[in-house]
């Protein structure tokens, strides 16, 4: 079964969203979450990757993440 991926480009520093990311992993312990700070990038500060083999689980985790972050913190979701 392939690993599915969602990418979230965030306009906040990693340290500013660390509590939300930790809470997300507590709620979705099977989620593979990557956090990649982007220095010098003007449109976003952190690229988050969410990975799972279960499409429903991945979508629920993505929805939970988006619900935890202020809407103006999200640059885009792919």
Task: Label the predicted regions.
Residues 1-78:
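Non-catalytic beta/alpha edge segments that cap or flank active sites
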């Amino acid at each position: 079964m392939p690993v599915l991926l969602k990418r979230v480009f965030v306009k906040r520093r990693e340290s500013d969203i660390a509590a939300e990311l930790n809470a997300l992993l507590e709620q979705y312990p099977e989620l593979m979450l990557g956090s990649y700070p982007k220095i010098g990038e003007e449109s976003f500060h952190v690229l988050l990757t969410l990975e799972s083999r279960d499409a429903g689980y991945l979508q629920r985790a993505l929805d939970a993440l988006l619900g935890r972050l202020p809407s103006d913190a999200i640059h885009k979701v792919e």
